Structure formats: C-alpha cells, structure tokens
From Swiss-Prot:
The keyword Ribosomal protein applies. Part of the 30S ribosomal subunit. HAMAP family: Ribosomal_uS8_B. This is Small ribosomal subunit protein uS8c. One of the primary rRNA binding proteins, it binds directly to 16S rRNA central domain where it helps coordinate assembly of the platform of the 30S subunit. SUPFAM superfamilies: Ribosomal protein S8. One of its GO terms (cellular component) is ribonucleoprotein complex. GO terms for biological process: translation. Belongs to the universal ribosomal protein uS8 family. It is found in: Plastid, Chloroplast. Keywords: Chloroplast, Plastid, Ribonucleoprotein, Ribosomal protein, RNA-binding, rRNA-binding.
Length: 136
C-alpha cells in the first residue's frame, strides 16, 4: 500500500479479477468511495458495503464476473483498468479533449470541479478535469 490510493484500488480490483476472487477489500477514502460508486453504477461491480475494523473503514466490493458463450465454449470477460494521471505526472483535459475509451465502450473517470464523474457526464456538463483512469 503506497500513497496513491487510486492506484491501490485499481491494482486490488485487477489482481482479484485475474485470480478469480469474488471480493476485494480496499481502504475507504472519499476518492475511492466515489470511484467505487461509479464502478457500481456502470456495472463493473456487483455490490459494495462499508466495513469497519478497529478505527479504519474498508470498502468490501463484490466483483461481477461476466461469462460469455460462443461456439468454442464459455469464456470469462476480464475488466481492464489503467491509471492515467498519477502523482508524478498529472494529466488534465478540457471537455472537448476528453478521450473516448474504446470508441465509447469503456469509461474514463475524471476528477472535476463538480466532483468525480465519468467521461459522458463531464461532456454533458461541458467541464474538463484530471483524467484519473480508464476502465473497459
């Protein structure tokens, strides 16, 4: 666990998804709570609950494992998460330069003056901000 709580959150979700774990436990901060709410709303997570141990709060998230059926059999889709703006190199954009992830199939999470939101919400509100991560 480092100082970058967003990278810790994304890495925990990515590792749990690769190891086919059902749940992920991450430290609860305002930023991680907002990102997890967006992931829940967009359908990348199944459920989230807040858990307290001693004096610390944790978010326990249940991952959504989607299985697709093809002619060759059933395969599990993976969730890809990529950290864009990091503490050593911040990436900012205006609303016209907000990237579309996979041509609109994925989402970009932005930190704006009106809070943390997806790329679609930021385009509708016509505001830019710091590009935190891509999820597809």
């Amino acid at each position: 666990m480092g100082k970058d709580t967003i990278a810790d959150l994304l890495t925990s979700i990515r590792n749990a998804d690769m190891n086919k774990k059902g749940t992920v436990r991450v430290v609860s901060t305002n930023i991680t709570e907002n990102i997890v709410k967006i992931l829940l709303r967009e359908g990348f997570l199944e459920s989230v609950r807040k858990h307290q141990e001693r004096n610390r709060y944790f978010l326990v998230s249940t991952l959504r494992h989607q299985k697709r059926k093809t002619r060759k059999g059933i395969y599990r889709t993976r969730t890809f998460l990529k950290r864009i703006s990091r503490p050593g190199l911040r990436i900012y954009t205006n609303y016209q330069g907000i990237p579309k992830v996979l041509g609109g199939m994925g989402i970009a999470i932005l930190s704006t003056s009106r809070g943390i939101m997806t790329d679609r919400e930021a385009r509708l509100n016509r505001i830019g901000g710091e590009v935190l991560c891509y999820i597809w």
